[in-house]
Amino acid sequence: MEGKKNNKPRGLMVFGAPCSGKTTFAQKFARKFGLAHYDINEMMEEHGFSREEALYVLELLMRTKQTFLVEGGIDTEAERSEMRNLMRKCGYEPALIWVQTDVATIRSRLKMRFRSVSKAKEYFDAATAEMEAPIDFEKPIILSGKHTFETQTRHAITGLADLVESK
């Protein structure tokens, strides 16, 4: 049986709690496969863009029709839906990768980052207050933020292949 061929570029949304390992995974995955990696929150903070401006820049970048990863600014179902719609409008096939890590590990990583228990707690509480777990129709590819990059990559590739097969 011949596999289904999907010629659309992929827009990979990488989602997870702070210090879950999403940025580490996204950067390594992008480097391994020669993909662009964008962070909406970083675009807004470092360049002073509004969310709309950051999404417009992404829309311009999508004209390249190259598969890419994006993280940040996709913490709610509404934000992810907006991103999926933009990707589809630009001819991309969206996929959601959800990096999960237990809360104890996240808190430990945040304590190391901030060198303060109170600052770590404050940051975690603020960052997760509005966060919404993906719902079934989003079909997230779930990765552990504690697994090796090689294991994460195998799971991500398998999950992406499964999405193609399910169409």
Regions found by a protein language model. Give the residues of each.
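Small-molecule kinase domains that catalyze NTP-dependent phosphoryl transfer to phosphate-bearing small molecules
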Residues: 115-156, 160-167
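Conserved phosphate-donor/acceptor-positioning beta-strand/loop module used by diverse small-molecule
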Residues: 88-110
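Hydrophobic anchor at the beta1->P-loop junction of P-loop NTPases
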Residues: 14
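Conserved beta-strand scaffold positions in the cores of enzyme catalytic domains, especially
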Residues: 37, 94-96, 140-142
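Conserved nucleotide-binding/hydrolysis micro-motifs of P-loop NTPases
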Residues: 43-44, 75-76, 100-105, 148
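Glycine-rich phosphate-binding loop used to anchor ATP phosphates in small-molecule kinases
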Residues: 49-94
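Conserved substrate/cofactor phosphate-moiety recognition/catalytic segment
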Residues: 17-66
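Phosphate-binding P-loop
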Residues: 2-9, 61
